[in-house]
A protein has these predicted regions:
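N-terminal low-complexity/disordered regulatory or targeting extensions
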Residues: 1-72, 86-336
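Conserved glycine(s) of the Walker
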Residues: 74-76
Length: 337
């Protein structure tokens, strides 16, 4: 594999950052100088290009990986063990100052059905400087939650009936504009680019629901919500987005619970957990059973943020919010593979 020099990566990051700034300036010019349909059309194009640049920028520091994905109970965990262990020995995971057998002490036991609910990354890098919290957990962000819940609704609903009307989308946007349009306080927890990422997901993956997608477009929901979303407090996001999953009460409840959990960590994208989070007989955060306990279980687990703040989070909700959990394997693995 050809390695790209850090200097080249830094140059690309600098260029994308400059381009992002230019798109912001273009967006401001459009807002101040164009009107009506011409303004909306130009704004869509600029905002869409800007959010693509932002996605590229955010991905530049990610390491290349090889990934395993497949059907349930076909031996993925054992394949990982065979790929990463040394001379057929058990695959050891470094958790603080101790090592643990991945298959026997961490990996969820198979019971004839899917057992793992969290993506696991293995690395030789030391991912935490705190031996008491050696596990790095990358969290889903607010936009990810919205997309996942929308996907759940559109993918798991056999027949969608009485979906939110164009008029309802328009009235919702109008009421939110009246309430938040003049607000000066803004946050970066959910921004305009995120709204256009959601819009793009609808276009790419819900294309079979052409009428619904077109009706949302006609209501100008995406553009109007994008203009004010950074002013809306997180405890009212469900008012903004529940219409997308047709006001399904269960999905809205899940959304509110998970957003509240993200709020506890100030919407950081990473937390660090102690070893009990993954060990069998303790937290077992990797086990898909945690997701089934989402609404009922009150068990908590200790995590530390990037600012070294120690918090207790709901275990099941942390599992649901985990985009990726990173475990450290022995450095000598790289020398033998």
């Amino acid at each position: 594999m050809h390695n790209i020099k850090k200097e080249n990566i830094d140059n690309i990051k600098s260029s994308t950052n400059q381009l992002y700034t230019l798109y912001n300036e273009a967006d401001n010019w459009i807002s101040n100088n164009l009107k009506f349909e011409e303004k909306d059309t130009a704004a869509y194009k600029v905002k869409n290009s800007r959010r693509i640049v932002r996605k590229i920028f955010k991905s530049l520091d990610s390491k290349p990986v090889f990934a395993l994905f497949g059907a349930s109970q076909v031996g993925k965990s054992y394949l990982i063990k065979n790929l990463l262990s040394i001379n057929g020995a058990p695959l050891k995971i470094s958790l603080g100052n101790e090592n643990y057998d991945f298959l026997k002490e961490i990996n969820p036991p198979g019971v004839g059905a899917e057992s793992t609910g969290v993506v696991t990354r293995f690395t030789i890098d030391k991912v935490s400087n705190n031996p008491d919290y050696p596990i790095r957990i990358k969290l889903l962000d607010s936009k990810d939650l919205i997309i996942i819940l929308c996907d759940s609704y559109f993918s798991d609903t056999s027949k969608i009936e009485n979906y939110t009307s164009i008029d309802s989308f328009k009235k919702l946007a109008e009421s939110l504009e009246e309430k938040y349009g003049a607000v000066n306080t803004e946050t970066a927890n959910l921004i305009q680019d995120d709204i256009f990422d959601i819009k793009d997901y609808f276009s790419k993956y819900f294309y079979k629901n052409t009428t619904i997608i077109n009706n949302i477009e006609k209501s100008n929901y995406w553009l109007r919500i994008g203009d004010i979303i950074s002013k809306v407090p997180s405890d009212e996001w469900h008012i903004v987005f529940s219409v997308l999953w047709n006001n399904n009460l269960f999905l809205t409840t899940v959304f509110k619970l998970l957003v509240a959990e993200l709020n506890k960590v100030n919407f950081d994208n990473v937390v660090y957990a102690n070893k009990d989070a993954v060990l069998r007989g303790f937290g077992e955060i990797l086990d898909v059973q945690r997701l089934k306990e989402l609404l009922a279980d009150q068990k908590t687990i200790s995590v530390v943020t990037k600012e070294n703040t120690i918090l207790n989070l709901n275990l099941s909700r942390l599992s649901a919010l985990s985009a990726e959990l990173t475990l450290t394997i022995p450095a000598e693995t790289a020398e033998t593979k």
